[in-house]
Amino acid sequence: MGGLAVAAMSVRPSLSFAAFRESETKFVSLRPSIDKRRFVSRAVEVIIKEVKPKIKDEKLRWMFENCFPNTLDTTVRYKMKNDRPDTFIITGDIAAMWLRDSSAQVWPYLPLMKDDRDLQFLIAGLINRQTECILIDPYAIAFNDGPLGSYWETDHTQHMVKELHERKWEIESLCYHIRLAYQYWTLTKDTSIFSADWHEAMKLVVRTFKEQQRKQGIGTYSFSRDCDRPTDSQINNGWGAPVKPVGLIVSSFRPSDDATQFGFLIPSNMFAVVSLRQLSEIEHTVYNHIDFAKECIALADEVDAAIRRYGTFNHPICGRVYAFEVDGFGNGLCMDDANIPSLLSAPYLGYCSFKDAVYQNTRKLIWSDNNPYFFKGKAGEGIGGPHVGLNYIWPMSIIMKAFTTDDEEEIRSCLKQLRDTDGETGFMHESFNAENAADFTRPWFAWANTLFGELILKVVQTYPNLLLQTL
């Protein structure tokens, strides 16, 4: 499975064939055999065959073939349930489904649905399953494949039922679901996913967002954990640091699953603005729920205005920038974390143009030593976060840097670094040591693998000559 390297040949027949034999052996596909793959998509197999000849760099080509189908190869459980598709997707080396990860894991496959009906059913099944999950608990981030319980059952929170794996409140979990459903609908025009249950789930989403604006008090959600990692629990008996209600939405935890320091996490609020506008369009067009659609737009506009008023500040070096977290009282956090949504990813998720002046200032800040979680070493440079500790770079940040520029040399540099920091495994990882890429975390992390594949596809489509050259 993900992360297993293929050993080079220990005996070579002759020096004249050495380079050929080493290459032939080193870059053998690390995908499971066809009979061991969890799901096979004809369209995905076709795109892999089409793209490989367009990548000159042999190792990068090999990594694309390993990474792009990794979610389908290794993480999918697909079946029919009550005559509707039902899909459960684990993260990789953790056998639970995160709303965030599972949505992102299938995202690059969506444009291929037009050529593969089975793939479309699989993604519809994921939307159906996620809808069930949200109805169980909109505050949870990760779910079991049934009422199996979890080793986090001892967490101190209000609603830890057996279907939940982890109940950390993160805005982006709900946003990722809306993003997935909206894009599925946009590409297929299929409205079968928009059931009465889906609408009820979306009413729950909006209700949860509004509750976490904290206008009527601290709400109904708290979370604390008996642990030796401060970032795994919230302060003040699980309610988090105080916030002043200014229109922003509290997120108790970040997309890294680490506790927020100040409750208003700006990248996730940006994502909420985009998602609420998408939700409004669906509710208006598909359901004809005009009043609810207006409610979604009004909430999006309120959050957006609050981001611009309370979520930016003047940095002494970089100028006007976005804060990472604020509390509405005037306190803020100047940093970025690699996980998506991040400040770096704002254009990727549709909040702003990558040419926006405030974004460009922010980008310069977070990709520099002005960001306490920017690391640079012998192996590479990029953004990390407190989840795995100091001096560990997340490949996800390097991928996102490439997604948010039109500078071909910058993209080339990112691709080269991604190629050279796989620890010779052929896969992406959660993070790697800035001084030694062979020291990495999570050998089987499907989200990062698929995101890397998505980047390669974008480069092939947008800058085809770049991959036909030596990096």
Which residue stretches match the model-derived regions?
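Extended, well-ordered alpha-helical scaffold segments
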Residues: 63, 117-133, 190-210, 279-310, ...
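N-terminal export signals
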Residues: 1-18
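Extended ligand-binding clefts on enzyme/binding-domain cores
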Residues: 99, 135, 139, 143-146, ...
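Low-complexity, Ser/Thr/Pro/Gly-enriched N-terminal "stalk/linker" regions
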Residues: 17-100
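C-terminal capping/lid segments that line or modulate ligand- or cofactor-binding pockets
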Residues: 156-162, 167-169, 177, 333-354, ...
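Aromatic-rich carbohydrate-recognition surfaces in CAZymes
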Residues: 95-231, 446-460
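Well-ordered alpha-helical scaffold segments within catalytic/enzyme domains
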Residues: 43-56, 104-117, 176-191, 270-289, ...
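Active-site-adjacent bridging/hinge elements
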Residues: 72-85, 148-157, 242-254, 424-430
